[in-house]
Amino acid sequence: MNLHHLLKARRAAGKPVRVALIGAGKFGSMFLSQVPHTPGLEVPVIVDLDPERAREACRTVGWDAERIAATAFTPDAAKATAGPIEVIVEATGNPAAGIRHARAAIAAGKHIVMVNVEADVLAGPLLAEEAQSAGVVYSLAYGDQPALTAEMVDWARATGFRVVAAGKGTKYLPAYHDVTPADVWSHYGLTADAAQSGGMNPQMFNSFLDGTKSAIEMAAIANACGLDVPSDGLLFPPCGVDDLPHVMRPRDQGGVLERSGVVEVVSSLERDGRPVFRDLRWGVYVVLEAPNDYAADCFKQYGLKTDSSGRYAAMYKPYHLIGLELNISILSAALRREPTGQPADFRGDVAAVAKRDLRAGEMLDGEGGYTVWGKLMPAAASLNAGADAVVTRRAMEQRFGGVAQTKQSD
């Protein structure tokens, strides 16, 4: 609660926090919009495959000509680790590139804030371990839902509550698993032309809709918070904020969860397409359990919504502000040497499920594409099913799963 005070002290001492940004897309641009309004924070290097696009993004978000002229725009990621940079923000969205950039940052003694949740789910526990050995911070990105959820889980546990469930809200119907970039805009109430004029990527937005992004983010939360994942994928139950304590409790207590201590996503739509009352589409939540009758009585006395037993309650944030909130991660790493969420285990994985019959030899086109959607699975189950051909996955299993692997390929 004192980041602003610490930053003011750094500024007064003439030692601003210097950041390099890799990837000036939507998330990165939202972060850049806050930089001129955060005295003591500087971004001297911006890396993007299209430097002119990155420069234009700075103009769009309100940077003046002097600030732009003082910034190095480059396609060379190696420039991010040069000079007096303290924190590197990886916001490319490309998992292979993200892992390379993170390892280079760690090797150079820089803190790394991983906006790239795909890279985090693939190799986050290993990267966090590598960073710790190097004496730097590896952090999830505050403003995105995994870090915000991890914060709520930490709050609940630090105050003595058992976490029953944690996760986020989204717009979901079962039919969305089969949606492709060709028809995604109809589900957002947009025309293709309107989406294009707004710079919206159909495949990226389809990954939000078809369930893939939810699976990836819940895997990140499970790995960071030590929570379990559902044994057969996310349920996406329709649920508003007032019903969280009723719905998000174990089945033997009247809820939908197979057990306590899991991640789950709630839908803002009823299964017939009607909107859920007081939905949590843009927010995050944690459901907690009172440890005793006294705490349960306090829930009631202070107006906390509970289930019928009075023992289960929920806390939530109705919105997340993406890159507008990213400074919290950057300043936490630089000024407190503390992450805003960090993977510590390999508990959740995401498996590709075909959207249609696939031809032999057909190339999968990634999250939000035409061929597959991503399903959340327990990591142990995905590895046992054979999803361990990638070298990084073998390393994850060896380090965090306790199962020795001897072959390098199957």
Each predicted region: which residue ranges?
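Generic secondary-structure signature for well-ordered alpha-helical cores
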Residues: 36-40, 59, 63-66, 132-137, ...
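Short, ordered loop/turn segments at secondary-structure junctions
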Residues: 49, 93, 117-120, 143-144, ...
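A structured beta-alpha segment of the ubiquitous adenosine-cofactor-binding alpha/beta core
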Residues: 64-96
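Rossmann-fold NAD(P)-binding glycine/threonine-rich loop
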Residues: 92, 96-108, 115-146, 151-155
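Rossmann-like NAD(P)H-binding beta-loop-alpha module
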Residues: 131, 139-209
